[in-house]
């Protein structure tokens, strides 16, 4: 019974702290009804946990009960909010530095189904043939129905060299398909670059990491030495996103000082933020084509949306993923944490792309691979690989043709002309 008393004590302290927080958040009189309802609900919550602790057929550790309750609460909020146990919380910092163990796959919950945003280029999932939009229905034979996002991530990670089987459903497949994938230490190089044709440069962003903005500058300076860049293809296809600040750093390299890149709105005042171009280093003297597809999400959509709204780039490809919310990682006292949606972001013209995505100015579909078609053998030389890709990639071909046409016409902005000044309403 000492364990039961401990659970009750912890829960009642939590309830009192929550009520105190609510009281300090505003006028007591105006919120008294809400506080009373909250207290009654917490009493019910405590009552249920106490019954489980005393009458459930098997003994359950108190922390497991509390963790399960927290997970259930967050699962009911939205697809991107989740509870992080101490192990998962420690791993959260790894992805932003560009190195972690697993399959190399970005996932989310879409319509309550575990869905692939994109496989990261060059990783085991990418080589295995996993595609954006694939629905993961089983992990190692376990159904993913009602599985929390953080739990799915944890199950797919593991020791490099170990194997895992995931089952996916895909449009065009009559039944689920099993993929056996060997885990690797995932090291993501966020920026790759090359020359498509003389004067037409190519920058591929795989993720938005801490040094992505700096790496973009390095690539541009490399190709601008001795010759002038006459056009740029910025490839954001299958880029699942990353750091908001990094997406702002990339966007502002192509916008005049003071131009709005993105703004966020949330319930808490400190979540209402505006990010403007600093003007530290602006590349404004050549046209840009931004490539997007279904695997372009979050930070990728911030960049595409900002450059599109200001008429700085033509967006080409297919509809992007549509993740327009901001998650904040909040540490908890026992080493665990919350990944909580705290705001939504908007493009300079006030567009929310959440659940909608960025619509390209020019839609170019990619041909679907034939059944049983194998990917081409890898080419180690980066420039040779890029030239080979250009032969097989209709979206990239169209981007180059468009830049060549702009070059002939001596244009440095979008063909449609300069946009009107965005009208932005921020609370």
Describe these PLM feature segments.
Residues 113, 199-200, 204-211, 365, ...:
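Well-structured core secondary-structure elements of compact alpha/beta domains
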Residues 95-97, 157, 353:
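Short Gly/Pro-enriched turn/cap motifs at secondary-structure boundaries
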Residues 83, 261, 275, 321, ...:
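Short clusters of hydrophobic/aromatic residues that line enzyme substrate/ligand-binding pockets
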Residues 337, 344-427:
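Conserved functional hotspot residues or short segments at active or partner-binding sites
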Residues 2-81, 114, 226, 389-398, ...:
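Terminal targeting/pro-maturation regions of precursor/exported proteins
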Residues 56-117, 161-180, 187-193, 246, ...:
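Extended, small/polar residue-biased N-terminal targeting/export presequences
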Residues 2, 28-41, 45-62, 115-119, ...:
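Cleft-lining beta-strand/loop regions that shape enzyme active-site pockets
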């Amino acid at each position: 019974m000492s364990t039961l008393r401990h659970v009750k004590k912890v829960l009642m302290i939590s309830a009192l702290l929550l009520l105190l927080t609510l009281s300090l958040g505003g006028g007591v009189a105006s919120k008294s009804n809400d506080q009373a309802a909250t207290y009654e609900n917490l009493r019910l919550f405590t009552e249920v946990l106490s019954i489980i602790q005393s009458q459930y057929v098997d003994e359950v550790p108190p922390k497991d009960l509390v963790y399960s309750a927290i997970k259930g609460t967050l699962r009911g909020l939205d697809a991107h909010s989740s509870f992080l146990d101490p192990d998962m919380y420690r791993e959260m910092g790894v992805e932003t530095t560009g190195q972690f163990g697993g399959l190399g796959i970005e996932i989310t919950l879409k319509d309550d189904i575990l869905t692939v945003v994109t496989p990261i280029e060059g990783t085991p999932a990418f080589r295995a043939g996993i595609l954006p939009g694939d629905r993961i229905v089983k992990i190692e034979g376990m159904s993913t129905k009602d599985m929390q996002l953080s739990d799915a991530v944890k199950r797919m990670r593991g020791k490099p060299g170990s194997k895992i089987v995931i089952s996916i459903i895909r449009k065009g497949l009559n039944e689920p398909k099993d993929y056996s994938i060997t885990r690797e230490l995932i090291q993501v190089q966020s920026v790759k670059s090359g020359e498509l044709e003389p004067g037409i440069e190519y920058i591929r962003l795989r993720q938005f990491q801490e040094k992505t903005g700096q790496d973009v500058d390095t690539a541009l300076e490399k190709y601008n030495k001795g010759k002038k860049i006459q056009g740029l293809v910025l490839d954001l296809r299958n880029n699942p996103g990353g750091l908001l600040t990094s997406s702002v750093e990339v966007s502002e390299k192509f916008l005049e000082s003071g131009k709005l890149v993105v703004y966020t709105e949330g319930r808490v005042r400190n979540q209402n933020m505006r990010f403007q171009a600093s003007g530290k280093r602006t590349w404004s003297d050549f046209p840009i084509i931004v490539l997007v597809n279904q695997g372009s999400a979050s930070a990728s959509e911030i960049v595409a949306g900002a450059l599109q709204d200001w008429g700085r780039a033509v967006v080409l490809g297919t509809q992007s993923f549509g993740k327009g919310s901001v998650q904040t990682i909040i540490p908890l006292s026992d080493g665990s944490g919350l990944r909580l949606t705290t705001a939504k972001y908007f493009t300079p013209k006030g567009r929310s792309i959440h659940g909608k995505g960025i619509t390209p100015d020019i839609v170019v579909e990619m041909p679907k691979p034939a059944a049983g078609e194998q990917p081409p053998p890898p080419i180690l030389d980066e420039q040779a690989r890029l030239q080979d890709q250009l032969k097989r990639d209709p979206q990239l071909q169209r981007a180059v043709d468009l830049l060549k046409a702009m070059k002939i016409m001596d244009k440095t902005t979008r063909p449609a002309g300069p946009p009107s000044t965005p009208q932005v309403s921020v609370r």
